[in-house]
Amino acid sequence: MSNQSTNDQDQIPSAEDTNDLIAQRQAKLDEISAAGKIAYPNQFKRTDYAEDLQKQFEGITKQEIEENAANGGKTQVSIAGRVMLNRGAFIVIQDMTGRIQLYVARKELDEDSLALIKSLDLGDIIGVSGYIGRSGKGDLYVHIEQITLLTKSLRPMPNKFHGLADTEARYRNRHLDLMTNESSRNTFMIRSQVISGIRKFMLNERFMEVETPMMHPIPGGAVARPFITHHNALDMPLYLRIAPELYLKRLVVGGFERVFEINRSFRNEGVSTRHNPEFTMIEFYQAYADYKDLMDLTERLFNQLAMDILGTTELTYQEETISLKAPFARLSMTDAIAQYAEGFDMSKVADRDYLADYAQNVLKQQVKEGFGIGKLQTIIFEETAEHKLRQPTFITQYPAETSPLARRNDENPEITDRFELFIGGREIANGFSELNDPADQAERFHNQVAEKDAGDDEAMHFDADYIEALAYGLPPTAGEGIGIDRLVMLFTDAASIRDVILFPHMRIKH
């Protein structure tokens, strides 16, 4: 069997062939050690990156490069990367920025260098020093003067044409996915840009970045089922955080008037194209602001991110054009029900019996005896309207029953000063004016405990320490959480949340 430089790039090896290829590669590594050479050298000084060189020489012709070299102006470079193609006269390597060709001038290289080039397999990592040239086809290349094997790849790479066609294989072997899939690499580079862009925006708005506990003695800050663990030394249960909210608001009580945290939260719930048990979010709080101020801030943030990363406020998501240009649409929950719930009688929007009947018999949703008007309205909204909110839309006036941490509206205490932002039929952000009345908060915690006792695993616990902190005085404050994974999905046109998480949770493969 010929070596991989001319064979295993063009077909998918069988299991037997894979074992043969691994054995061949191991033999090559053994030869290096037997010759008294360092198998994994750690000394190579890279001076350049592929993308930087492509940009530096963009528009400079082959003739201009050669004339410059003839006049003593060779551009010397040192570059390193993974071998993606080896066709004898030309090698293609890939580094963190992209790909570039290497030119093999056989008459100018010594025997050791030629032997090394001949033995290269796809996936090997090499370092090259030489000078810049351009091929007759116009491709930029590095003319090899010195070449060093830095790391021997002992396993064959996925086929460059078929790649990792199986989606699950891509998730389980993200290192291979990134190695062979340019689209996947771009996705995670954009993810990095989104996070750094959010951080830059918040710092410019005078927010302070903070860190709060990942393990909580009492789960809180959101209505969700937590992961539970046990602290052996303290002999007490701990909960992976479902949200950092209650800790962040303690910081506002303490005098940090604008705080934010970008970190993971955990919810022991279902896995889908929109949900992962471990997810990344930014949560932030601003004193002397209300929920309307945060809607305005969110519009500015999304507009800035789109312009900085995409160069436009219009993007395409799943073949649908979405505009992130402000202002976003704003619609109350009941108005959304009126607009999207087919056959719904709006004259009975506050009639519990009618709401329960519609939810159960029209929408086929489970209705429990303890569900109030607000809970039923929320169910109907989620089932009839949520997925139809394609363009950015703030839904406001959420019921107090389903918003245990939000401030009641001054004119109608049955609703709260809260919003959720939907884009592409998915919730992207949730924010509200914060409840800062300790007596009202204690009452709502008691209601949540009653729901938990009635069998609702997602209802909140009573957090006495937080009530005590509120009693010292929380200034008028608004807070918001933005799901970064879903935002990245939007910016990268990803159909599944797993496409934008480097290592999504998967069932163990036996």
UniProtKB/Swiss-Prot annotation:
Keyword annotations from UniProtKB, A to Z: Aminoacyl-tRNA synthetase, ATP-binding, Cytoplasm, Ligase, Magnesium, Metal-binding, Nucleotide-binding, Protein biosynthesis
CDD domains attached to this UniProt entry: LysRS_core (cd00775), LysRS_N (cd04322)
Amino-acid positions noted as binding Mg(2+) 2 in the UniProt annotation, renumbered to this chain: 427
Keyword Metal-binding: yes
Broad class of the protein's primary localization: cytoplasm
A Pfam family: tRNA-synt_2
EC number: 6.1.1.6
GO CC entries: cytosol
GO BP term, example: lysyl-tRNA aminoacylation
PROSITE patterns: AA_TRNA_LIGASE_II (PS50862)
Cofactor binding comment, as recorded: Binds 3 Mg(2+) ions per subunit.
Catalyzed chemical reaction(s): tRNA(Lys) + L-lysine + ATP = L-lysyl-tRNA(Lys) + AMP + diphosphate
Binding site for Mg(2+) 1: 420, 427
Entry's localization field: Cytoplasm
Recorded superkingdom: Bacteria
Molecular function GO terms recorded: ATP binding; lysine-tRNA ligase activity; magnesium ion binding; tRNA binding
Disulfide bond positions: none
Cofactor: Mg(2+)
Subunit structure as annotated in this protein's UniProt entry: Homodimer.
Family, similarity comment: Belongs to the class-II aminoacyl-tRNA synthetase family.
HAMAP family from the UniProt entry: Lys_tRNA_synth_class2
Name of the protein in question: Lysine--tRNA ligase
Organism per entry: Psychrobacter sp. (strain PRwf-1)
Organism lineage: Bacteria, Pseudomonadati, Pseudomonadota, Gammaproteobacteria, Moraxellales
Gene: lysS
